[in-house]
Structure formats: structure tokens, C-alpha cells
Regions:
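Active-site cofactor/substrate anionic-group-binding motifs, chiefly glycine-
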Residues: 39-79
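Active-site-adjacent beta->alpha loops and helix N-cap segments on the catalytic face
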Residues: 1-6, 25-27, 51-63, 81-89, ...
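Conserved, mostly hydrophobic/aromatic
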Residues: 17, 43, 92, 172, ...
């Protein structure tokens, strides 16, 4: 049962997160992945997490898939305009990478290339809408594609409960988010409160 099938089955899903290497040697990443093999349903692969430059998540996911792992490729709006986002997604689909987690991305000043210019051509809600269009066989401008994608797109949410978070979450679900992931949770009471609050959504 793959990740998408397990989501639809209602069974409990377990994922782990791995950062691509800061370089071209994937041995360390693959060794990390081996520690959770047969334990997790998919491995999240970050996209320049905390604005620190690393190998493309597309290449990292491809390397992991060659070793038999199912992946969830992170894709941020920070570094790419709508052309580059679509190219990256089409490339991912052609390589069998069909699980995508979209997010805005940390601002570059937080990372190791403080002078980098952010893009943010689209926000995460618009990126989810873009993925819906690719799945329907069209690009963002409505032009027909040669073959359509089959992405299972997810989004992120902050467990800090406020009205703005709830509005954003509703928009993400409306735009096709099939799953929601949060940062690591250490306060179970707060997380239970978060789950109760979003349950009606």
C-alpha cells in the first residue's frame, strides 16, 4: 500500500524527515534513510530548509526512490517563480515523485546566503491550485499539457491556534490539500487542542 492509498484508507500514517546533503554525496542521506526503512510510510525531503542551500529535493527524492523509498518532496515558493515551479513539478512527476508538500519557505535572511533574493511569485495556496491544474492536464495559464500529473499534494499548518491559521487552513483544503503536516510536536496537550479546533474543517 503506497502513501496515497494509506491516506485514503484512514490508517495511521508515519513519515520521517531527511535533509538533502550540502554537496553531491548522498551516502549520508541514504544511511539516515536506512534507519527508518520498513518503519515509515514515506520520507519527507526538505527544500533548502531554514534557507540553507542544499541539493535539490528533486534529485534527493530520485536517489531515495532508486533505493526503494517512497518520498514526499517539499516545494517552497521562496526560490522559484511560477515557470520554475511548474518545470520542477513536471520533472518530479516524470520521475515518479507524486507526493508533494507545499509551503512558503523560510525567508533567506535566516539562512547561509543572506543576500539571496526571495521570489514568492505564488503563495502556498496558489501553488496548491497550480498543482490541481497540472493534475487536470493544464498549466497555470490554462494551456493543455502533454499528459497530466497525478500528484498527492499536502500543506503545512502551525499548531498555534488563531483565526488567521484557521482561515489559511480552510483555503489550503479548498485548493486540494490531501494531507496536512505540522512541525514536530512536543506539547501533546496543545496538539490535542489543535486537533479539536480543526476537526470541523
Amino acid at each position: 500500500m503506497n502513501f496515497q492509498e494509506k491516506l485514503h484508507s484512514g490508517k495511521f500514517v508515519i513519515t520521517a524527515e531527511i535533509s538533502p546533503p550540502k554537496g553531491i554525496d548522498t551516502d549520508g542521506m541514504l544511511k539516515e534513510a536506512s534507519l527508518v526503512k520498513d518503519i515509515v510510510d514515506a520520507i519527507n525531503v526538505t527544500d533548502n530548509q531554514r534557507a540553507v542551500m542544499r541539493m535539490s529535493p528533486l534529485a534527493a527524492c530520485s536517489a531515495l526512490r532508486q533505493e526503494g523509498y517512497e518520498t514526499i518532496m517539499h516545494l517552497t515558493c521562496r526560490d522559484r517563480n511560477r515557470l520554475a515551479l511548474q518545470s520542477e513539478l513536471l520533472g518530479a512527476s516524470s520521475l515518479g515523485i507524486n507526493n508533494i508538500l507545499v509551503m512558503s519557505g523560510d525567508y533567506p535572511t535566516k539562512g547561509d546566503h543572506a543576500g539571496a533574493k526571495p521570489v514568492y511569485d505564488l503563495d502556498s495556496v496558489q501553488l496548491l491550485g497550480l498543482i490541481q491544474k497540472l493534475n487536470a492536464g493544464y498549466d497555470f495559464s490554462g494551456n493543455r499539457l502533454e499528459g497530466k500529473t497525478g500528484f498527492c499534494a499536502g500543506a503545512v499548518a502551525n499548531t498555534e491556534i488563531n483565526e488567521l491559521m484557521l482561515i489559511k487552513l480552510r483555503k489550503k483544503i479548498k485548493m486540494g490539500a490531501a494531507f496536512i503536516q505540522t512541525q514536530a510536536v512536543f506539547d501533546t496537550g496543545r496538539f490535542c487542542e489543535f486537533m479539536d479546533k480543526i476537526d470541523p474543517i
